[in-house]
Amino acid sequence: MTYLFKQIGREWRFMLRQRYVLILLLCSFLVSGFAVFTGLAEVAQQQQTIERLKLADVRDRLEAQAKYNDPGSLAYYSFHLTYSEPSSLAFAALGERDVYPWKHRVRMLALEGQIYESDSQNAELAQAGKIDFVFVISALAPLFIILLFHDLIASERSSGRHDLLVSTAKSKYALWGSRGLVRFGAVVLCLMLPFYIGAMISSTGFQAVLLVSLWCVVYLAFWTVLSVWLGKNLASAPRIASMLIACWVLLAFVLPILSDLLINNSVHSAKGGDILLTQRETVNDAWDLPVSTTMEAFVTNHPQYSDYTHQGEGFDWGWYYAFQQVGDQAAGEFSNDYRAAAANKYKLAGYATLLSPPLLLQRKLNRLANTDALAAFEYEQDIRDFHKALRMAYYPWLFAQEKFDKTHLTSLPQFKDSTHNYKKVQNEQ
């Protein structure tokens, strides 16, 4: 053991005299630091946006409540902010937050149109365009590992020192193990140190930091073992580097793109635009239909309001909100198919990650950070649950002629972000 420590100390001093190694380590530190810095800035911007919108949301709703006195007008002119806050780990894994919406302002109109006004593609397998910490570790770090380890043994062979080093060393495993351990420890430190600083700034929990560290070290060890194994069995450093880079390109870029294309071509569903069009056509057509036609469709799902009677010959808020809901009912089948297809794509993407370690790491860390497609699905369900609770609060005033008083507005449901729940994410791991 003492000999091993001496070897490690010697290899550390030897590494510090190798300029190209130091340059690679510095580059890895700078790239990781840049990714963490931009991640922290993005999360801070999202949090500031949410806080600003919260204040505006309360102000706008109070203005509407001061201006209108009947429940129909209040429901129409009152917007409600919904949002999905970034977790404390989101700075390291921004995930799908640039693909799926994380904020919506909804009101008691047909919900499908409000959700799908901007359609989003399922990009679970699309290669990330942003540079966050997960992208650096999964896609760029293997290149640093390859450059550091491809010639660990081959360079000594080409210089003629290999046989001398092996013959004079007490153990070839201690010789190459200490050299590899020093380089591996150095590159892991350079890549992970910015993450630890970012975790302290964002107050990330210890368990989350530990799990991220574990996944990253295992992933980097995979590339290190692959590089050393090829270097041990091949004599030419350029040939070793070429093979490793080919593996890197295949696993980090080619397989994800092919998997994405295959999944998108094999799973079909209605588009968000189709859902939006169906809902809006139903709502627009309702203006020309008899009130009884709309109410029959409405009470199919809301039988408790079957005694509702249209107030007068003109416009009536109850009828208006009834055909808004009927519009959602008409688009419901398309919406369910769309969401089922998105969930199926995510499931198939999980199988594809078994062929691509970079994708597997991204998927695991995005799940830990609660920034993946599942988090987006949960946020959308929160919106639907909140909208339903809001409707159930207003419907007795609109359809059952219950007495309305503005003091009742204080008991209206409030949106709560349930996606930002680290313990829940851990239970799903």
Segments predicted by a language model, with ranges:
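Transmembrane alpha-helical segments and their membrane-interface loop/helix boundaries
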Residues: M1-A126, V249-Q429
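Helix-loop-helix units of permease transmembrane domains in multi-pass membrane transporters
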Residues: L147-A186
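Hydrophobic/aromatic residues in alpha-helical transmembrane segments
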Residues: I145-F149, F222-L226, S242
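Membrane-interfacial helix-loop-helix connectors in multipass membrane proteins
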Residues: Y196-W215
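Long, hydrophobic alpha-helical segments
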Residues: G129-S155, S159
